[in-house]
Amino acid sequence: MRVEHIIGNIKDIDATHLDIDEVQIAWYDTKKKIARLNSQNGQVIAMKLAQAPKYGLNNGDILFLDEHKIIIISILPTWVLCMKPTHWHTMARLCYEIGNLHIPLFYNKDTMKLQAPFEQPLQRILEKQSIAFEKKWCVLDSKDRINITYPIASEPKLIQSPHFSIKITQKGLN
């Protein structure tokens, strides 16, 4: 089966009369635009999205839908460090450390907590900085990922000049 676009999300439709088949993926695979996937019922899916979702695939995204069957994305749970800073300077230290480690950061609106995939170095930093956290087994959904919506500094635009030349010389040779 070939999938070229996401139809919607199961949360937005009534799927009580449909056979639900799930494609399980890890949170870090949700940004993929092209993938070969297998559903729990053995359906092979060649996903080649014409346009990648803005923030990635979400839990419950619909890959296929007809009158009898629906195939959805199911993001696998993983170990997560959950943090709820109580003061602005704790938040600043936390964001600095997470950014310094290049670890993605998620915000769970239901629990009002920041979440990061479990990494031992981050846990050690949180302990050393006395920042309260708990380790939980949960789903990291793309819709909850904190992203920079615009580039802080745009990439330089390089233009090759037709008058550009390089001369290489070696010292000491006559």
Curated annotation (Swiss-Prot):
Gene designation per UniProt: ureE
CDD domains: UreE
A cellular component term, taken from the record's GO annotations: cytoplasm
Gene Ontology biological process terms, A to Z: protein folding; protein-containing complex assembly; urea metabolic process
Stated family: Belongs to the UreE family.
Keyword check for Phosphoprotein: no
Signal peptide residues on this chain, from the entry's feature table: none
Keyword Chaperone: yes
GO molecular function, one term: unfolded protein binding
Name the record gives this protein: Urease accessory protein UreE
Primary site of residence: cytoplasm
Functional description taken from the UniProt entry: Involved in urease metallocenter assembly. Binds nickel. Probably functions as a nickel donor during metallocenter assembly.
UniProt subcellular location: Cytoplasm
Keywords: Chaperone, Cytoplasm, Nickel, Nickel insertion
